[in-house]
Amino acid sequence: MRTGVVVMLTSWLVAEAICNVVAAEPMRFGGPTMGTAYHVRIAAAPSADVKRLQVNVEALLAEIDRQMSTYRPDSELSRFNRAPAGEWFAVSGATAEVVAAAQAISKKTGGALDVTVGPLVRLWHFGPKQLGIKDADTPFKPPTDDALAAAKESVGYRNLDVRRDQPALRKQIDKLEVDLSSIAPGYAVDCMAALLKESGLENFMVEIGGEVRAAGQRDDGQPWRVAIERPIAERREMYAAIELVDAAISTAGDYRRFFAHDGRRYSHIIDPTTGRPVEHSLASVTVVADTCLEADGWDTPLLVLGPERGFECAEQHSVAALFISRGEEGEAVRPTTAWRERL
């Protein structure tokens, strides 16, 4: 689950402005997908058949949606969520790959990433049809301890098994459900990038809901550049622009979706281990990685862990991450060793 992620549109427009292209007009297209939008920009490809590319990209995204959507009752994931415990449920290799990637990060972060956290998200009114807002007058009361305890009984990544050989999922408790919205968009971005490369394209930037991957260079021969947003709720403001060279980037933040109640702020970033919204000073985490699956998978759990534990975890696993925290004298910015080496 992610905030209005900040690296493109909202940030696509920022990236477009940063590019300031002076060469030939680039090819671009986009459309709705996964409850958000996708965008493709292709540079230095005068012979590319844009219409055919768009058809192929949208067919690819439709297939991923058919596999991993929780909005569609007929998707693989929705059918698995209705299945009984204790039995292997056959899924596509793609779904098994994404779940396995999420489970690996869950283990490395001590459960800070948990794709079974949906009941807790809904309990705090941050589900797909429950928009967290920043209106202090919004009638909202935090759930009771009993309600939290009941919801936590149906949550836990350790209650989920995945196998890649003869791909399948298995739940250990009947009420367990899986939601891949915290990582599936990154996987879809990687798939779009692979499709473009298979089509002979070398210079492009692709994005879904703020998850970005770039290859090659812009029309003017310069590296692609993307914006990292300053983590403030009142307005959209660029903190920095970075060059993205054959890499992916993703940002998680706690400053767009939240409730206020009795003078207390409740973010949509839920700590699966406590069942409650995080309350530390860390406002956003940006991750750069070779794949968007990796970048998308790491940003939220590092944010959940907070400014100290998250940073230590990122250092331990050589994650290129930028931590921006709130401080009494403004922002405190802390890059990991891998971030400094990479950028």
Where do the PLM segments sit?
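Mature catalytic core of soluble alpha/beta enzymes
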Residues: 2-343
